[in-house]
Amino acid sequence: MAKRINFTSCLIFTSCFTAFIVSLCLLVSSCVNLVNDVIIPSVHMSRRADITPFIDNYTINFTDLHFFTDGANASVPQPEAIFINSNNFSLYAHNCSARDNCSVHSASITQEGRCYHYSRAKYSFAGCLEFCRSYSPCYYLINPQKHMTAVRQNINESDTYWVGIFKSPKNTWVDLDNSSVTGVHDLYEDSYCAYIGLYTEVPWPSFYCDTPRRCLCGGSKGI
C-alpha cells in the first residue's frame, strides 16, 4: 500500500512539475513576443543641411537662430519667437523702380496689376524670403489676400505655400510692407508664420517656420 501511495505521489508531482515548466515557457514566450511587438517612438533629429537651403551669404541665418546643435551636429527646434524677434524683415520688402516690375514672362499667374510665382522647390519660411528675392528683382514673399480665390485655384491639392505674413514682435500679424493683417485663422497662440493651401480660405498659422513648403512670390506688374 505504501509503495502504491509513493508511486501515485510521484506521478502527481511529475505532472505538476511538467505543467509548471510548460506554463513558465509560455510566459517567457509571451513576454518575448510582447517586447517585439511594442513600437518605441523615436525623435527625428534634422541636420543643418536638411533645413537651410542657402549656405552662402544667408542674411537671415535661420538655422543658427532657430536651432541649437549638439556634438553630432543635430538640431532641436526652439520657439519661433527667437526667429521673429531677431530679424529685420523689412530687408525683404519690395523696393524697386517701374522698370524692374515683374512681367508676365516671369509669373505663374497675373491678377489686377500683380504677378504671382509658385516655387517648385520647398523651403523654410526664411528660405522662401531668400528665394523670392533672388528669383526676380521685384519679387518678394507676398501677402495674397487680395487675390486669394485666384491664387488658391492654381495650388495643387497636396501642396502648401509660405506667404509673406508673420507675427511681429508686438504679437500682431503683419506683412512685408509692415501693414497689419487681419483674417489669419489664428488657431495657436505661439504661431509665427502663415501659409496657404487649396483648402485654406484664409492664411493659416504655423508654429514651426522651418517646415519645408513651397513659396508664393509676388510683385507689381509692369505696364
Swiss-Prot record:
What this protein is called in its record is Putative C-type lectin protein 51
Query: What SUPFAM superfamilies does the record tag this protein with?
Result: C-type lectin-like (SSF56436)
Where does the record locate the signal sequence feature?
1-31
Q: Which residues form the C-type lectin domain?
A: 111-218
Keyword Signal in the entry? The reply is yes
What organism, scientifically named, is this protein from? Answer: Equine herpesvirus 2 (strain 86/87) (EHV-2)
Keyword Ligase listed: no
GO MF term set: carbohydrate binding
Kindly give the InterPro entries that the UniProt entry links to this protein: C-type_lectin-like, C-type_lectin-like/link_sf, CTDL_fold
Cysteines paired by S-S bonds: C193-C209
Q: Which UniProt keywords apply?
A: Disulfide bond, Lectin, Signal
